[in-house]
Structures are given as C-alpha cells and as structure tokens.
Amino acid sequence: LFKKNKITHLQGAASFVDKKTIKVSSSDGEKNYSATNFIIATGSSSIAIDAIPVDEKQIVTSTGALALEAVPQSLLVIGGGYIGLEMGSVWSRLGSKVTVVEALDRIVPTMDEEIAKEFMKSLKKQGLEFKLSHKVISTKAGKSGVEVSMESSDKKQITEKYNVVLMSVGRK
C-alpha cells in the first residue's frame, strides 16, 4: 500500500520545520523531508504497574505475548479489556490454560453490560477462566513460573503459579 500510494515510511524523532517540512533524527543522522501531507503515527506503549515488573519473557505485554516461542501451559491475563481477552482467546485455542483476572466486577467495562455478559459466556465456552473483582498485589518470577498474589474485593488473598503472565491493563 505504501508503494502504491507513494508513501515514504520514516522512523525516528521528528519535528516540524514549517508546514510542509519535517526534520527527522534517527540513528542515520538528521534529514529534512518535504511533503504536502504527513501522517504521524506515534504508536503506544503498555501501562506499567510497579508491582508487576515486565521482563517480556515470563511477564509480558501484548508485544511480548506475540513473540513467545512456545505455547505456555498456563497463562494469566491481567486485565479484562479488549487486548487481553483477544490474546487470551488466541492462546487458549492454541492449548494454553488461560485465566483472566480483572479488578472490576465485569470484563470490558466500556462495552454494553449485556453484550459483555454474552461475550464472557462465549470466552468461558472456549475454556477461559475468570477472577472478577480481584486485583494483583504482587508477582514473583522464578525458574518454575510466576507466583502471583491476588486479593478479592472481600480482602481474601490467594497465590497461584502460572508459566506466563500477560500484563494487559491498557495502553498510553
């Protein structure tokens, strides 16, 4: 599509020189580019939580989940939003035992409540398990997996072990 539409892809830090010129700084140095229109795609990054140190090996973001070399036997998805549920659904179909932990009392809070309930039923039929109204209070990665401590809304604490933890509480 880029070639067909005569679009040049650039990567680096950019700033506007004027309305039709940008200066791009990259590992190759600085260079000015002129055009009638520019598309600026800054991308996004996963929201971090201090108690959950991401290493992209055992505790991963959606980016790391796509780079896993093998299907984990068990996967905990932290966050019941669109990205985490999509990733969880895929890994479940590939053979992973997937559990989703969500701090709220339902998944995908921006979705209509009735539709979200039906969506959750569908995901349960695929084999996903849910821990709603639970929050992760700590994680500890080790050779045999990740130990995850969670607390329910009634302050009961549980600790479980997973091969991989997917941190999916949002992007910024």
Predicted regions mapped to residue ranges:
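Rossmann-like dinucleotide-binding cores of NAD(P)H-dependent redox enzymes
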Residues: L66-A67, P72-L76, Y82-Q157
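FAD-binding core/adjacent interface of flavoenzyme oxidoreductases
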Residues: L1-I78, S149-K172
